[in-house]
Structure formats: C-alpha cells, structure tokens
C-alpha cells in the first residue's frame, strides 16, 4: 500500500539499531501522496484563478522530529533518535534548511487544506505495523 518512504525506513532501522541519527536542522512539512492527490484533484476541479497553490500538510517539523514521532507511534522510546546536523549527513544534492510552504492561496479560494502530518503518520504507522506481521 505504501511504497518506500521515511516512515518505513525509520521502522526498519528501529528494529536493526539501538539508535538512529537523523538531521535536525532541516524543517519541512511531511506530506502524503494520498492527501496531495486529493488536493490536486480538488484544485483542478475548482474554478480557481491560475497560479501556484501549495499542497503540503499542516504543521512543520524537522526530520529529527519526524523520526521521533515515528518512534513514538511505534511505541518506542523517541530518545533512541539522535540529532545530527546537515553537515554530518552528506547528501547528493543540497537541501534547504527551511522548506515550509504557506497556504494563503488555498484558503483564499476555499480549497480544503491537507490534514496535519501527525494525523496521517498515525494511520501510516498502523499500516506499516500491520503489513510487517
């Protein structure tokens, strides 16, 4: 049901390691494709002015905070997740430190916002746990 994703990776690493190191200085909005798909369909189906609309979940967090939330949802100690800086985790492409997008245009045209990322996280973790049994 869910392809490869951060939640599955954290769940797998939780079973393999005592601690997991995750970047703590990049802030974003975890967003699920099921929510984004609904949002895109709603925007395309509505008579809204041409322009840019940000389809991201409510709320913001760091990758570190997201990983801690995954551990919490799994019933594991979130202090098993250790914060590291972007400099300590080399990636092939640079990532922005702050990639939170506003929803002003969405609100202005009456399109429903995406749910808070923690709502979908709880559902996803339940699915991941069910699928691994």
Predicted features and spans:
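Hydrophobic "lid"/C-terminal helical patch
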Residues: 10, 40-44, 67-70, 103, ...
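Residue-level signal for the nucleotide or nucleotide-sugar donor/cofactor binding architecture
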Residues: 1, 28-31, 61, 101, ...
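Short, surface-exposed alpha-helical segments at coil->helix boundaries
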Residues: 4-8, 64, 68, 100
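NAD(P)-dependent short-chain dehydrogenase/reductase
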Residues: 1-28, 34-35
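Mid/C-terminal beta-alpha module of Rossmann-like enzyme folds, strongest
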Residues: 39, 46-93, 133
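Non-catalytic, hydrophobic alpha-helical segments
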Residues: 36, 40, 55, 66, ...
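C-terminal amphipathic/interface module of NAD(P)-dependent oxidoreductases
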Residues: 94-133
């Amino acid at each position: 049901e869910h392809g490869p994703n951060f939640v599955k990776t954290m769940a797998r690493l939780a079973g393999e390691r005592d601690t997991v190191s995750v970047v703590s200085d990049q802030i974003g909005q975890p967003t699920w494709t099921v929510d984004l798909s609904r949002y895109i369909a709603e925007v395309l189906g509505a008579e809204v002015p041409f322009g840019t609309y940000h389809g991201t979940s409510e709320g913001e967090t760091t990758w570190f905070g997201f990983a801690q939330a995954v551990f919490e949802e799994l019933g594991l100690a979130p202090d098993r997740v250790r914060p590291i800086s972007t400099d300590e985790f080399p990636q092939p492409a640079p990532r922005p430190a702050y990639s939170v997008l506003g929803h002003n245009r969405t609100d202005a045209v009456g399109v429903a916002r995406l749910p808070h990322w923690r709502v979908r996280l709880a559902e996803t973790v339940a699915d991941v746990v069910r699928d691994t049994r």
